[in-house]
């Protein structure tokens, strides 16, 4: 009997060889840790950043709307218009002097500055500054009156939340508006009562 045939019969099915790439490739690891709190913290941080940006924008808008800031911004155009007005007036006086002495140069002088236009711009800047200063004075007077007749701080932000735990803190803006409306209505009622009483007295006489 051939021994090679026994060896062939006893040998099993050929085994598959595993490539070294398959042996060395690591299996993907699943992420661990609670995923819930992280998005909540990110949302909270984003909300805080948005609130800070809104507050900065409101502060910048308030600074732009401030009357004193507008007056300061008009100082540059006022100086420039004043300089142009004086220069154009000097040029006009020089031209008139030459015309009176019959020495007018018929040659072209290029662009001749208009005195009336520069003077109008100068007066426009002065009017704007005067308007802003008067408005600032009226705001200060109203602030003094409100502090005298309604002693108490008012929140600077119109939609600022009111802290209920601090009753001595500043009153919210809507409450302040309602209080002002009540005061105005009371003053109007007193005025109407005095007028009706004066009319009744005059009719009785």
From Swiss-Prot:
Residues 1-27, 39-61 have a biased composition (Low complexity). Keywords: Activator, Nucleus, Transcription, Transcription regulation. GO terms for cellular component: mediator complex. GO terms for biological process: genital disc sexually dimorphic development; imaginal disc-derived female genitalia morphogenesis; regulation of transcription by RNA polymerase II; sex determination. Residues 1-65 are annotated as: Disordered. InterPro entries: Mediator_Med29_met. It comes from the Eukaryota. The keyword Nucleus applies. Residues 28-38 have a biased composition (Pro residues). Coiled coil: none annotated. GO terms for molecular function: DNA-binding transcription factor binding; transcription coregulator activity. It is found in: Nucleus. Component of the Mediator complex. Component of the Mediator complex, a coactivator involved in the regulated transcription of nearly all RNA polymerase II-dependent genes. Mediator functions as a bridge to convey information from gene-specific regulatory proteins to the basal RNA polymerase II transcription machinery. Mediator is recruited to promoters by direct interactions with regulatory proteins and serves as a scaffold for the assembly of a functional preinitiation complex with RNA polymerase II and the general transcription factors. Belongs to the Mediator complex subunit 29 family. This is Mediator of RNA polymerase II transcription subunit 29. It comes from Drosophila virilis.
């Amino acid at each position: 009997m051939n021994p090679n045939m026994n060896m062939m019969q006893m040998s099993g099915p050929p085994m598959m060889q595993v490539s070294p790439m398959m042996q060395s490739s690591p299996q993907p690891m699943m992420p661990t840790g609670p995923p819930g709190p992280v998005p909540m913290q990110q949302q909270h941080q984003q909300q805080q950043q948005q609130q800070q940006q809104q507050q900065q924008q409101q502060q910048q808008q308030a600074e732009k709307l401030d009357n004193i800031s507008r007056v300061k911004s008009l100082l540059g155009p006022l100086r420039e218009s004043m300089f142009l007005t004086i220069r154009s007036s000097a040029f006009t006086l020089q031209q008139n002097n030459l015309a009176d002495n019959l020495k007018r140069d018929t040659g072209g002088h290029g662009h001749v500055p208009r005195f009336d236009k520069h003077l109008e711009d100068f007066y426009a800047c002065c009017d704007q500054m005067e308007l802003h200063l008067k408005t600032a004075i009226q705001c200060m007077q109203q602030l003094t009156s409100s502090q005298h007749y309604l002693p108490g701080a008012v929140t600077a932000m119109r939609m600022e939340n009111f802290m209920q735990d601090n009753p001595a803190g500043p009153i919210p803006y809507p409450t302040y508006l309602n209080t002002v409306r009540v005061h105005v209505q009371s003053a109007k009622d007193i005025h109407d009562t005095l007028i009706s009483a004066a009319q009744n007295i005059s009719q009785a006489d």
